[in-house]
A protein has these predicted regions:
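Membrane-proximal extracytoplasmic
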Residues: 1-248
C-alpha cells in the first residue's frame, strides 16, 4: 500500500489496520502490518557461530533470545532472519490408541493447544503492594508435551504419550544461507525505524550485541557482525560537509 508523501505515517497505518479489521478473511488467518521502515532501512547484518550446535539450535536461539533482545534497542523496527531450521515438536497420533481410550483427535488437539498458552490473572493486594498473577503455560521440552493430560477416565489420567509418539522435528526449509566458506548459517538483518539516526542506532546495537555475547548467550555461541552502514553514513556526512564548505568559500 503506497501513500502520498504528505500523509502522516501513523495515520496511514491506522487506516490500513481499520480496513484489515473489516475484511472478511478465512478462519485462522490473521493479517499483519509490517513495522514502519523505509526502503533504505537495512543497517546491520550478522551471523551466528558455534562449534558445537546445529543450525536448528542456532535458529532457535536467534528466534527466542537474540531477536527479542535486539528489538528492544531504540530505533530498531524489525529483525529479519534467514537460514537454519525452525524447530517444531511433532505429535504422531496412534489411531488404535485413540479408539482404545475412546478419545477423538480433536480432543487431543484441544488438550495440547490449551496447555501451550500463557494466561493473565488478577492482582493480589497485600499491605501496600500489588502482585500480578500470571500463568506460564508455554511448552518448553518434549517431556512437558508428552505428559499433558488429555482426559481422565475413571480417575486415571490419559496422557499425550499414551496416545501418540512425540519427537522433535522442523518445518520444511524454504532456502539456505551461506557465507564465505560456510554453506549453512543463520543470518539476521536489522532494519531501522523510519526517521531514526542510523549512527545512534548502530552504536546502541553494537553495545547490545556485546552484552549478549558476554552475558546472555551460551559460551559456544557468538554473534558475528559482517556489515553495518556506519562507514557509509560517515562518508556521506563527510562528503556533504566538504561540499557545503566549498560552496560557502566559493
Amino acid at each position: 500500500v503506497m501513500f502520498e508523501d504528505r500523509v502522516d505515517d501513523f495515520t496511514a497505518r491506522q487506516q490500513v489496520y481499520n480496513l484489515l479489521n473489516d475484511a472478511d478473511l478465512p478462519d485462522g488467518v490473521t493479517p499483519e502490518v509490517q513495522p514502519l521502515y523505509g526502503p533504505t532501512g537495512e543497517i546491520f547484518r550478522y551471523t551466528l557461530r558455534s562449534d558445537k550446535r546445529s543450525v536448528r539450535e542456532l535458529k532457535t536461539i536467534q528466534d527466542w533470545v537474540i531477536e527479542r533482545n535486539l528489538r528492544s534497542v531504540s530505533g530498531v523496527a524489525d529483525i529479519v532472519s534467514f537460514g537454519g531450521e525452525v524447530k517444531t515438536f511433532e505429535v504422531s497420533v496412534n489411531p488404535h490408541q485413540l479408539i482404545n481410550y475412546g478419545i477423538t483427535s480433536l480432543e487431543l488437539y484441544d488438550a495440547i493447544a490449551k496447555s501451550n498458552i500463557n494466561v493473565g490473572g488478577d492482582v493480589i493486594t497485600k499491605s501496600s503492594q500489588a502482585y500480578v498473577v500470571r500463568g506460564i503455560g508455554l511448552i518448553n521440552d518434549l517431556d512437558e508435551l508428552r505428559n499433558i493430560v488429555v482426559k481422565n477416565i475413571n480417575g486415571t489420567p490419559i496422557l499425550v504419550k499414551n496416545l501418540a509418539d512425540v519427537h522433535e522435528s522442523c518445518l520444511p526449509r524454504l532456502g539456505q544461507v551461506g557465507r564465505m566458506d560456510e554453506n549453512d548459517v543463520v543470518q539476521g538483518i536489522v532494519v531501522m525505524r523510519k526517521g531514526e539516526n542510523p549512527g545512534e542506532v548502530i552504536a546502541n546495537l553494537k553495545d547490545k550485541i556485546e552484552e549478549l555475547n558476554q552475558n546472555v548467550l551460551p559460551e559456544d555461541v557468538r554473534i558475528i557482525p559482517f556489515y553495518d552502514r556506519e562507514d557509509l553514513v560517515n562518508l556521506a556526512v563527510k562528503t556533504v560537509t566538504h561540499n557545503l564548505i566549498e560552496g560557502i568559500l566559493l
